[in-house]
């Protein structure tokens, strides 16, 4: 596994990802583990781990709250980095290339492990992707944490509304109903089974989600393209069309 002394991590800004940071601290103390660096958009929870001595260095490409901003001014090992230093795929020194574990959120994830963090289930823009696809591609272990359903809306779907991060970059999906491991990572699957965690296929999670919410009706679009989704290398991997 990667949860060893000197590991590196990034957590996303979704509620589930932030909760992981809080619970991880207790396990780090119990196991006497300290992280070499924490990366990405920095939040109060990451600052807390840093100030407790659990994360040696914070590499900050974006402060997400006032606590992080204040920390940047007073903690010498809380260091500001540029987006180029953070995740430029053409740079040999990009920080994401040194990541052991990244924990990300998702609006949708489909049965091919493709992830959507841009558009909602109604096809309308909801937010930005930040370094989602960059960290997912570069980290040694990429974990998506999300609820199986949000109200009446399934998170695990047949096909994502918009593909932001290709499924080939996602290793594990953790939901409140079970854990799915990408078949491309059989060694990760073995670790999860050995730990007696509730592992199931992503298709089973999809069926369970639909049994609770029903299968969503297809969104109707016009032919007008209102957004172009570029992957980290600049290639176009999807488009967003105007909803009727």
Q: Where would I find each of the regions flagged by the language model?
A:
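Conserved phosphate- and dinucleotide-binding cores of soluble alpha/beta proteins
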Residues: 1-8, 19-28, 32-36, 44-244
